[in-house]
Structure formats: structure tokens, C-alpha cells
Curated annotation (Swiss-Prot):
It comes from Thiobacillus denitrificans (strain ATCC 25259 / T1). Keywords: ATP-binding, Chaperone, Nucleotide-binding, Phosphoprotein, Stress response. Coiled coil: none annotated. This is Chaperone protein DnaK. The modification Phosphothreonine is found at T199. GO terms for molecular function: ATP binding; ATP-dependent protein folding chaperone; unfolded protein binding. Induction: By stress conditions e.g. heat shock. InterPro entries: ATPase_NBD (IPR043129), Chaperone_DnaK (IPR012725), Heat_shock_70_CS (IPR018181), HSP70_C_sf (IPR029048), HSP70_peptide-bd_sf (IPR029047), Hsp_70_fam (IPR013126). It holds the Pfam family HSP70.
Length: 639
């Protein structure tokens, strides 16, 4: 059985960890960083860049560089949150045939799951490079307030990336695992305040010792899946663009290249204002008009930034109140407050949390890594490596069906511990009704139209009977991933229809399989490109070496041999420019063979040079001197 890795698939950054010798370890990526920007770029030559390389080229390729795609995953194009993003993103958000929000890059429509899969593939490769073995299983985290469609879409992204997603767990719950695993302080109630790049969650969790077992029980959860650091950045972008417009009369928002530069500068300024009281955004040659180039220089104080985002911070407090109310607790009953997500580094956010809960948040949890660490611990639990840990999570939103009059009848209330199962008997609305449509909903509104539709299915061939007589038993079953399975059964005939809820949107099995094949083809292409680069490097090294030797020792070989070497050199150079891996390797080997005589001459010349030097000192190199001196050496270990 392979290793189960833990992945925090974030809006802005992602992170991967694994259990090693009983402890979770965050793995550094190929660039040497512990977190990877959740950015995917599609280059003109078909190459797909992920992470830091994608971020570096974003300014010159804004329309084909996708960031914050987590805000679109599992969402319908018509949703107001998606419509809001359409006007803000430099890349194109389009409506898919199934009504989902997809992106368009280089005239190709792509699902958010496909883009997310590229990030997951990078995380998978990071783990494989570190472990030295193939990784096929993972625990992936999602915001606690993600609905069923978003959870299912995240699981699909894992499949496209070549991962079997063993468990989907909520980000605050994962952070609680990371925090509480080594704490032996008895029963504690903690609040996990998770303000990430694109989502906000608050979870109230009880950590208890039960018969020697560490039990993590989520008492309640709440949040906003469209509130995060990206929104804080946007407030800063809007302000800087407005100031520039006042001063120069040019609207930077109409220029995608300028906007991308502005986004990078705003993100940097936001980070600087967490430690400093003032910063300056300097962007020379940001744009130009008839009068010539324009330069941007705007000073921003911490107080100004705080006033710009005050409303966003206030928006996080209402879910905190609701979560406490649902848990039946007051702020004084919370023992610890944990901050998760990069945006919680902002002093004003820390102050708001401190003011609400009446206590200093803990500083001993890394806000960028805690979620991945918790996911790795859950992977260890599933693998049997981590023992005596029980995780009891909840469903964040109520689940039910549409009944007569367009009302939502709830079968499973929000904050119910999962996995769980609930059944209720319904009947027909008309005489002799032969079929019923079960319309599955998720949300807290009383009317069906105000809630998220998760899908629907029919139960047909109901025997004719007066209305209200047939007994249709509807059963909801939520698995440990928080994903819903629904069945409807006619109790009179025993006829049953069941489905795993796949939203009226979502990807079909055929689409997922096609995307898996695309991803595999990309991986194969990547490997071929990697091997080609290796062959070119080896050839370049050989060409350089032979050219150098030819310049120094060319007069020591015959004219024919020199001509053969020069011919082999030219063929090798041509192969490097235009050839495939096999051609390059063949021509490199031919060059090595052709230059063999030259190498011999070079070796003899080096020996001749070394001989006089050997004769002037101790004659240890001469024949007949068999004395061997044993040298003592001390190994110096790195401190």
C-alpha cells in the first residue's frame, strides 16, 4: 500500500504534507518553497506552467494565466458570485454546455476541475520526488462551507490528476487536527477562524480524551465561500486604480497587462502593510497615452488599507456568532482560538478576532501549513499509521427535498455529524399519480427556490391510488466526505431508485475520463520534454568539450581524423537544434566515438605535463616504489 498524502488545495496557495515516522512533514516543491501558488498558465507552445513559473509570466500572459479557480469550482455560471468575478478577472469565464462556470484559454473551454487538477498534479509530483515512489492516494481539504457540488467537483479534480481521493475533509477540521494532535491538556473547545485566499470558514470544535482516544468533534460550522484575501487585494487594486485615474485621467482597469501588474503590486503592498505602517506602490511605465508614458506612484498607509477592507473583516464576524449559537456556546466557553489562512496575518483581522472572542488567538499554528498537516494526519489515520484519533465532522448546510407548494422539507439539518443517514415517508400530491420527482436541495431557506439544487431523479411505476395513499420512503445518506447519496422507495411494491447526487451541473463520467486521458497525455508530453532537455544538455556539454579539445590538440591528429570530428560536431549541433531525443543521442554517441583519438592525444599531453613535476619531488610515482602512505583523515560533519 502506497503513502496517502495530505493536500491543502487553496485559492491562492497550495501545500502538500505526508506522515513520516509518526510525524507530519510539509514537503518543499521543486522551487524550494513549502507552498505553491495556485496558478496555472497555458503557454503559446502548449506548455502548462504551474506555481511560481506561472506566476512569474502572468504579467505578459494575463488572459491565459488562471488564478483563484477554486472560486469557480462546482459553481453555476449564473451565480451572482461568478458574475461578479467575470468583471474582475483578466481571463475569460464562460458558460459550459451544462451551465457550469468554466474558463477559456487559447480558444479552448476548460472546467475549473481541469485547472485544479494541474495544481494537484504538481502537489502529487512534489510528494513523489521527495518520497521516491509513486503516489496515487490523497486526502484533500475543502472549505467547511463548500456545498455538495463543490465537494464532488474537488473529488473529480483529484481523479483527473491521477489521485484516488480517500477522503475530503474540511479545512478548519484539518487545522484542528494539526493543532490538537500533540496537546495533552484535557478536554478543550476551540474556534478555528480560517480566512484564506478566497473563502472564509469558522468551526467550533471540541477536542476530548475518550477511553484513551483523541476525539475531534465538530460542534458547528459556518462561513462564506466567496470572501477571502483575493477580495482584500481587489479593494486595494480599486483604490490605486481610482487614485491613478484622478491624477492621470487614465482607467487602468481597461488594460489587462496594467491590471496584472497592479494585482501583483497590490498583493505585495498588502503583505508589507502587515508589518509596516506605510508602503508605496511604484509601477513605472504602467501605461501610455498620446502625451507619452505614465508612471504610477501611490503611497498607502496601514490605516487607509484598514478602512478599505473594514467591511470585509466585519463580514466574518456574523458567521462566528451563528457558529457559536449553533454550538450552544458563548465566547467565554472557548478555550483557544486558532487562526488559519494567510489573510489572518493582517493585524486588523487579529484584532477583530481578539475583540470578538475576548482572548488572544494562538500564534503556535502556521496559518499556511496547518491545513495540509491536518490532511496528512487524516491520511495517517486512514492508513493505520496514526492510531487513537477519531474525527467527527459535520455537514455545513441542511439537506432536504422540494415538497408541495415549492417548500423545502429538511431531512438532515445543518451541523449534523457525518457519516449519517435519515429517512422520511412522503406521498403523492395527485390521484393516480404514477411517478414522483425527487428534487434534492441544500441550504437554509424555507422555499425550495432559495436553496441550491443538487439534482433530481424520478421514481416511476407507482400503482394507481388516491392522493396521499402511496408511501414513498426517501433516504438521505451522507458519507464521510460529506457527499450525498439519495434513494426513493415505493413501500408497497419495493421498487427503488437511488443515485449518488451529481448536480444538474457537474462533470459526467465520460467527461472525467476524457480529462483524465488529457492529463495523462500532458504528463507523457512533459516527460518527453524533460528527456529531450536532458539529451540536449548532454549533447551541448559534449560539443563544448570537443570544440575546446579540438582548439588545443587539433594539430596532434591527422587531417582525416580532424575532418571526421568536425563533421560529427556539425551533425551533433544540427541535431541539438532540430532533432528528437533519439537523433540527438545517436549523434552525441557518434561525436564521442569520432573524438576518441583526440581524447587519447589530450590524455598523453596531460601525462607528459605531469611527468616532470613528478620527477622533481618524491619518486613515489616511479616503478619499484611500492610504499603506500596511509593518510589519516577526520570526517567533518555539517553542523
Amino acid at each position: 500500500m502506497g503513502r496517502i498524502i495530505g493536500i491543502d488545495l487553496g485559492t491562492t496557495n497550495s501545500c502538500v504534507a505526508v506522515m513520516e515516522n509518526g510525524s507530519p512533514k510539509v514537503i518543499e516543491n521543486a522551487e524550494g518553497a513549502r507552498t505553491t501558488p495556485s496558478i496555472v498558465a497555458y503557454a503559446e507552445d502548449g506548455e502548462i506552467l504551474v506555481g511560481a513559473p506561472a506566476k512569474r509570466q502572468a504579467v505578459t500572459n494575463p488572459k491565459n494565466t488562471i488564478f483563484a479557480v477554486k472560486r469557480l469550482i462546482g459553481r453555476r455560471f449564473e451565480e451572482k458570485e461568478v458574475q461578479k468575478d467575470i468583471g474582475l478577472m483578466p481571463y475569460k469565464i464562460v458558460k459550459a454546455d451544462n451551465g457550469d462556470a468554466w474558463v477559456e484559454v487559447r480558444d479552448k473551454k476548460m472546467a475549473a476541475q481541469q485547472v485544479s487538477a494541474e495544481i494537484l498534479r504538481k502537489m502529487k509530483k512534489t510528494a513523489e520526488d521527495y518520497l521516491g515512489e509513486e503516489v496515487t492516494e490523497a486526502v484533500i481539504t475543502v472549505p467547511a462551507y463548500f456545498n455538495d457540488s463543490q465537494r464532488q467537483a474537488t473529488k473529480d479534480a483529484g481523479r483527473i490528476a491521477g489521485l484516488e481521493v480517500k477522503r475530503i475533509i474540511n479545512e478548519p477540521t484539518a487545522a484542528a487536527l494539526a493543532f490538537g494532535m500533540d496537546k495533552k491538556e484535557g478536554d478543550r473547545k476551540i474556534a478555528v477562524y480560517d480566512l484564506g485566499g478566497g473563502t472564509f470558514d469558522i468551526s467550533i470544535i471540541e477536542i476530548a480524551e475518550m477511553d484513551g482516544e483523541h476525539q475531534f468533534e465538530v460542534l458547528s460550522t459556518n462561513g462564506d465561500t466567496f470572501l477571502g484575501g483575493e477580495d482584500f487585494d481587489q479593494r486595494l487594486i480599486d483604490y490605486i486604480a481610482e487614485e491613478f485615474k484622478k491624477e492621470q485621467g487614465v482607467d487602468l482597469k481597461k488594460d489587462v497587462l496594467a491590471l496584472q501588474r497592479l494585482k501583483e503590486a497590490a498583493e505585495k503592498a498588502k503583505i508589507e502593510l502587515s508589518s509596516g505602517q506605510q508602503t508605496e506602490v511604484n509601477l513605472p511605465y504602467i501605461t501610455a497615452d498620446a502625451s507619452g508614458p505614465k508612471h504610477l506612484a501611490v503611497k498607502i498607509t496601514r490605516a487607509k488599507f484598514e478602512s478599505l477592507v473594514e467591511e470585509l473583516i466585519t463580514r466574518t464576524i456574523e458567521p462566528c456568532k451563528l457558529a457559536l449559537k449553533d454550538a450552544g456556546l458563548t465566547t467565554s466557553q472557548i478555550d483557544d482560538v486558532i487562526l488559519v489562512g494567510g489573510q489572518t496575518r493582517m493585524p486588523k483581522v487579529m484584532d477583530a478576532v481578539k475583540d470578538f472572542f475576548g482572548k488572544e488567538p494562538r500564534r503556535d499554528v502556521n496559518p499556511d501549513e496547518a491545513v495540509a498537516v491536518g490532511a496528512a494526519i487524516q491520511g495517517g489515520v486512514l492508513q493505520g499509521e496514526v492510531k487513537d484519533v477519531l474525527l467527527l465532522d459535520v455537514t455545513p448546510l441542511s439537506l432536504g427535498i422540494e415538497t408541495l407548494g415549492g417548500v423545502m422539507t429538511k431531512l438532515i439539518p445543518k451541523n449534523t455529524t457525518i457519516p449519517t443517514k435519515a429517512s422520511q415517508v412522503f406521498s403523492t400530491a395527485d390521484d393516480n399519480q404514477s411517478a414522483v420527482t425527487v428534487h434534492v436541495l441544500q441550504g437554509e431557506r424555507e422555499m425550495a427556490s432559495g436553496n441550491k439544487s443538487l439534482g433530481q431523479f424520478n421514481l416511476s411505476d407507482i400503482p394507481p391510488a388516491p392522493r396521499g395513499m402511496p408511501q414513498i420512503e426517501v433516504t438521505f445518506d451522507i458519507d464521510a466526505n460529506g457527499i450525498l447519496h439519495v434513494s426513493a422507495k415505493d413501500k408497497a411494491t419495493g421498487k427503488e431508485n437511488k443515485i449518488r447526487i451529481q448536480a444538474s451541473s457537474g462533470l459526467s463520467e465520460e467527461e472525467i475520463q476524457r480529462m483524465v486521458k488529457d492529463a495523462e497525455a500532458n504528463a507523457a508530453e512533459d516527460h518527453k520534454a524533460f528527456e529531450l532537455a536532458g539529451a540536449r544538455n548532454a549533447a551541448d556539454a559534449m560539443i563544448h568539450s570537443v570544440k575546446k579539445s579540438l582548439a588545443e590538440y587539433g594539430d596532434k591528429v591527422s587531417a582525416d581524423e580532424k575532418a571526421t570530428i568536425e563533421s560529427a560536431l556539425k551533425e551533433a549541433e544540427d541535431a541539438v537544434r532540430e532533432g528528437d531525443k533519439e537523433t540527438i543521442e545517436t549523434k552525441t554517441n557518434a561525436l564521442a566515438t569520432a573524438s576518441h583519438k583526440l581524447a587519447e592525444q589530450m590524455y598523453q599531453a596531460e601525462q607528459a605535463k605531469a611527468q616532470p613535476a613528478g620527477e622533481t619531488g618524491n619518486q613515489s610515482t616511479g616503478p619499484g616504489n611500492d610504499d603506500v602512505v596511509d593518510a589519516e583523515f577526520e570526517e567533518v560533519k555539517d553542523k
